[in-house]
């Protein structure tokens, strides 16, 4: 698209009730429905569909064939008003799908800032994704999944409904988790993913020093290597958390579980 070309392709269909910032670009054959709000600097590529109620922040990029804000894939959904809220500077690659929430699940799906969602990623109804995450090709989140900041999910990996994935966690290629994944943890590629240590390389890249990583490793060994019952492991983590905010974050995550902890 040149500087002199129209920012909205003539084949795009935009509902009069949609609200787009002046500099939003919309590609060929894209559909933008009513009650959609798109912030400044956002680029919507060709053959995309965005349905409302959906709120999209600034400087996002939707590559071809992304389907955003569609109805939840939940038989209990009865047409009630629900929404999708997306923050700033996210990238949605080819054929990504993100669904709105359900009335019974809180009514909202949220995506934070600075996330990369690669081709064929699916984010289901009532999910909540933090900031600076990378979802590789064919990542699948079932309904009501919560993902913390800086999570990396490898290709063809997925999470069972209602699972939580803690900040800085890493899921390997094809890993499927049916339980909560504590912060900093790596999940292997078994038929159902199992913890395989902490995400040391990712933490180093984000500026965690040796002392912080050592404390996280100690907590991981307490939780997964020592063979302790969960209640006893939590007691030891409580002691360790007094000297480490990172261990405290792990303990807080465990204390607020809705699904069984992945062990």
UniProtKB/Swiss-Prot annotation:
Instruction: Give an example GO molecular function.
Output: acyl-[acyl-carrier-protein]-UDP-N-acetylglucosamine O-acyltransferase activity
Pathway the protein takes part in? Glycolipid biosynthesis; lipid IV(A) biosynthesis; lipid IV(A) from (3R)-3-hydroxytetradecanoyl-[acyl-carrier-protein] and UDP-N-acetyl-alpha-D-glucosamine: step 1/6
Specify the superkingdom: Bacteria
Reactions accelerated catalytically:
a (3R)-hydroxyacyl-[ACP] + UDP-N-acetyl-alpha-D-glucosamine = a UDP-3-O-[(3R)-3-hydroxyacyl]-N-acetyl-alpha-D-glucosamine + holo-[ACP]
Which Gene Ontology terms describe the biological processes this protein takes part in? lipid A biosynthetic process
Q: How does it assemble?
A: Homotrimer.
PANTHER family documented for this protein: ACYL-[ACYL-CARRIER-PROTEIN]--UDP-N-ACETYLGLUCOSAMINE O-ACYLTRANSFERASE, ACYL-[ACYL-CARRIER-PROTEIN]--UDP-N-ACETYLGLUCOSAMINE O-ACYLTRANSFERASE, MITOCHONDRIAL-RELATED
Which HAMAP family does the UniProt entry name for this protein? LpxA
The family assignment reads: Belongs to the transferase hexapeptide repeat family. LpxA subfamily.
Name of the molecule in the record: Acyl-[acyl-carrier-protein]--UDP-N-acetylglucosamine O-acyltransferase
Q: Which organism is it from?
A: Stenotrophomonas maltophilia (strain R551-3)
What is this protein's gene name?
Answer: lpxA
């Amino acid at each position: 698209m040149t500087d002199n070309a129209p920012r909205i392709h003539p084949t795009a269909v935009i509902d009069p009730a949609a609200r787009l910032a002046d500099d939003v670009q919309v590609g060929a054959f894209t559909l933008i429905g009513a009650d959609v709000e798109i912030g400044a600097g956002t680029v919507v590529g060709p053959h995309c569909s965005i349905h409302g109620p959906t709120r999209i922040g600034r400087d996002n990029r939707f590559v071809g064939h992304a389907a955003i804000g569609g109805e939840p894939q939940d038989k209990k959904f009865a047409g009630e008003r629900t929404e999708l809220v997306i923050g700033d500077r996210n990238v949605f690659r080819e054929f990504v799908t993100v669904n709105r929430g359900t009335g019974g699940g809180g009514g909202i799906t949220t995506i934070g800032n600075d996330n990369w969602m690669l081709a064929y990623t699916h984010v289901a109804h009532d999910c909540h994704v933090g900031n600076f995450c990378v979802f590789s090709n064919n990542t699948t989140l079932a309904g009501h999944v919560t993902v913390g900041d800086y999570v990396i999910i490898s290709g063809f990996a997925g999470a069972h409904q209602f699972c939580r994935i803690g900040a800085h966690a890493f899921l390997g290629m094809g890993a499927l988790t049916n339980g909560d994944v504590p912060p900093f943890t790596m999940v292997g590629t078994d038929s159902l993913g199992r913890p395989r240590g902490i995400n040391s390389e990712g933490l180093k890249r984000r500026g965690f020093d040796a002392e912080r990583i050592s404390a996280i490793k100690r907590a991981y060994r307490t939780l997964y290597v020592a063979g302790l019952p969960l209640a006893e492991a939590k007691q030891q983590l409580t002691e360790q958390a007094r000297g480490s905010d990172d261990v405290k974050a792990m303990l807080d995550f465990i204390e607020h579980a809705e699904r069984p902890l992945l062990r």
